[in-house]
Amino acid sequence: MAIEKVIIQNFKKFKNPFEVKFNENINLLVGDNESGKSTILEAIHVALTGMYAGRNIRNQLSTYLFNREAVEEYLASVKNEQPIAPPEIMIELYFKSGTLPEYEGNGNSEKSDGIEGIRFTISFSDKFNSEYESLLKTEKITSLPIEFYEAKWFSFSRDEKMPRFIPIKSVMIDSSNYRYQNGSDVYISRVVKDFLEPEDITAITQAHRNMIDEFAQNEAIQSIYEKISAASTVMKGKLSLSADQEV
């Protein structure tokens, strides 16, 4: 197997750096429900292909991709007027030596030389610093400002990459998460991409995020949260309703 190790941080259930090692043959992930088996596979797939749930990850960045505890810590710091850095998703794939020599370097979280691999991040983009500072001063932030985030890929040699040019590929078969795009979806996405300026898209995303925040804080929805959680006998964690964050 080309991948020897995966390190995941702040992606879904994995807050602190979580490491999984693989052998060259068949690898089986065994664990209880909600232990993160599917999340590990999703992390590998998105880091290699840029696809999540059947769609380009750049088109569906969402706070739900982030570890909830990390997001809550960030929001608490903003509320206390001592904001910490917005959380960042990091996925690193360590390749077997000799797989992709041009991907070799120390651009990894371990700062180790002579290692081949790819580093995928969903992180706050510094180009939005002024807009973010303005948001902190003028608005009450109750959710992650995902409109200021970008998804990027880098080889361990620190060269930025496009996922379609990463030679190693993965196939993830999970029909439960696959979402098909109809003709109108494709047309609207093309219009947004081709005709709107970046500041227009940011404004739309902020308005959409505010709408979702209002939905989550609605008293009727809060009451339904409590009923759902009380009725649930399948999962240990809390169940809740949420509005779709795709724009």
Regions found by a protein language model. Give the residues of each.
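Residues in well-ordered beta-strands of folded domains
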Residues: 21, 92-94, 121, 152-154, ...
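A conserved P-loop NTPase coupling/switch region
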Residues: 136-197
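Extended helical coiled-coil dimerization/tether regions that scaffold
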Residues: 187-247
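Pre-Walker A-like glycine/lysine-rich segment at the N-terminus of P-loop NTPase domains
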Residues: 1-50, 55-70, 79
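Nucleotide-state sensing region of NTPase/ATPase domains
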Residues: 67-156, 160-162
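Non-catalytic alpha-helical coupling and interface elements of nucleotide-dependent molecular machines
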Residues: 45-53, 125, 156, 193, ...
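Short flexible coil/turn linkers enriched for glycine and charged/polar residues
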Residues: 14, 85, 233-235
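Short, flexible loop/turn elements at secondary-structure junctions
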Residues: 10-12, 26, 95-99, 124, ...
